[in-house]
């Protein structure tokens, strides 16, 4: 099993989980194709993390890309940046800029 992570990504976890669903339980090649045609920002971020996990597998254990599949995709909630928006009569409303931690684990088929 080979893991790659990206932390503090400025994508809402709810939207990143939609993109993560495109690659669950697929071979690595299929997952890359799915993410490359996705127009979501989270899809681009997940593709970079997936490429990192594939590079870890190829460089550390000399495993071919065709034999790899996505074992686990995890999208966790990161810290939130808090901003304020001006409202009427001197009031204000909170704005939460959400972040995500992305984790992709790949391994050989049958693990």
From Swiss-Prot:
A Gene Ontology BP annotation from the UniProt entry: translation
The UniProt keyword set, sorted, is: Ribonucleoprotein, Ribosomal protein, RNA-binding, rRNA-binding
Q: Does the keyword rRNA-binding apply?
A: yes
Q: Which domain of life is it from?
A: Bacteria
Gene Ontology terms, MF aspect: rRNA binding; structural constituent of ribosome
> InterPro entries recorded for this chain?
Ribosomal_uL22, Ribosomal_uL22_bac/chlpt-type, Ribosomal_uL22_bac/org-type, Ribosomal_uL22_sf
The Gene Ontology CC terms held by the record are: cytosolic large ribosomal subunit
**Pfam families reported in the protein's UniProt record:** Ribosomal_L22
Family named by the database record = Belongs to the universal ribosomal protein uL22 family.
> Which PANTHER family is this protein grouped with?
CHLOROPLAST 50S RIBOSOMAL PROTEIN L22-RELATED, LARGE RIBOSOMAL SUBUNIT PROTEIN UL22M
Q: How does it assemble?
A: Part of the 50S ribosomal subunit.
In terms of NCBIfam families, this protein maps to:
rplV_bact
Q: What is the documented function of this protein?
A: This protein binds specifically to 23S rRNA; its binding is stimulated by other ribosomal proteins, e.g. L4, L17, and L20. It is important during the early stages of 50S assembly. It makes multiple contacts with different domains of the 23S rRNA in the assembled 50S subunit and ribosome. The globular domain of the protein is located near the polypeptide exit tunnel on the outside of the subunit, while an extended beta-hairpin is found that lines the wall of the exit tunnel in the center of the 70S ribosome.
Name of the protein this chain belongs to: Large ribosomal subunit protein uL22
């Amino acid at each position: 099993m080979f893991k790659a992570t990206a932390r503090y990504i400025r994508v809402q976890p709810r939207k990143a989980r939609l993109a993560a669903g495109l690659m669950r339980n697929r071979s690595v090649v299929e997952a890359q194709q799915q993410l490359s045609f996705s127009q979501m920002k989270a899809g681009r971020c997940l593709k970079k993390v997936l490429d990192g996990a594939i590079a870890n597998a190829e460089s550390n254990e000399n495993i071919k890309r065709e034999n790899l599949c996505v074992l686990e995709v995890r999208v966790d909630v990161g810290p939130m940046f808090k901003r304020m928006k001006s409202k009427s009569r001197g009031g204000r409303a909170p704005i939460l800029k959400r972040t995500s931690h992305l984790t992709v684990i790949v391994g050989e088929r049958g693990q």
